[in-house]
């Protein structure tokens, strides 16, 4: 979220986002109308159009928020020579704290390009450069697709492991497959 947004704007946007997540649990983004979003959020359409041009713009804003948070946990103040586990725990905890939103965004029926957007972040693309040669793209796809599948499976379990437990599993798999990995 933008730092210059006041509390009222943030609340309106949150209500719109929560309403879209709720609606996407029952229908595709293509069948959700702005009127339905506004009705569910109890916000008029003028307010909606003040911030977004369509339901797709709202979805993109939601995706951008998640990608920004994940990218912040991957990079920023975290030392890349440090332990991968700390970064994984932060990402899994963020997903756990925003489970409904992440379940919705990680559902391939909503935006099939979301996994690609998530793993094309500069901090994730670092993996490709670390494993040069003709196999680097395959290694990157293997790790990213597998990571995405693990996260989706974990999110959809009824009795999920704690973020720390799944992060340990995740980190263990990565360290066995790529013992020199420092990309996350």
Describe the residue ranges of each PLM region.
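N-terminal positioning helix adjacent to the helix-turn-helix/winged-helix DNA-binding module
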Residues: 5, 12-15, 135
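Alpha-helical structural segments
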Residues: 11-22, 26, 40, 57-76, ...
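Basic, amphipathic alpha-helical hairpins
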Residues: 22-29, 72-73, 98, 127-131, ...
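N-terminal intrinsically disordered/low-complexity leader segments
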Residues: 1-9, 180-184
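Hydrophobic alpha-helical segments that form the core
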Residues: 136-157, 161-177
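Helix-turn-helix
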Residues: 23-57
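Hydrophobic alpha-helical connector segments
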Residues: 75-101
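Amphipathic alpha-helical packing segments from all-alpha helical-bundle domains
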Residues: 108-148, 179
């Amino acid at each position: 979220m933008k730092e210059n947004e006041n509390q009222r704007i943030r609340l309106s946007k949150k209500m719109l986002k929560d309403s879209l997540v709720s609606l996407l649990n029952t229908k595709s983004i293509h069948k959700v109308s702005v009127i339905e979003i506004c009705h569910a959020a109890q916000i008029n359409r003028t307010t909606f159009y003040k911030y977004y041009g369509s339901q797709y713009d709202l979805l993109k804003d939601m995706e951008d928020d998640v990608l920004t948070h994940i990218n912040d946990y991957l990079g920023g103040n975290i030392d890349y020579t440090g332990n991968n586990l700390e970064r994984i725990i932060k990402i899994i905890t963020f997903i756990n704290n925003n489970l409904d939103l992440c379940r919705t965004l990680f559902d391939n029926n909503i935006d099939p390009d979301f996994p690609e957007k998530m793993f094309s972040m500069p901090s994730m693309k670092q993996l490709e450069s670390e494993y040069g040669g003709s196999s680097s793209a395959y290694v990157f796809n293997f790790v990213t697709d597998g990571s995405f599948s693990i996260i989706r499976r974990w999110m959809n379990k009824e009795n999920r492991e704690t973020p720390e437990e799944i992060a340990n599993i995740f980190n263990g798999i990565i360290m066995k497959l790529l013992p020199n990995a420092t990309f996350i």
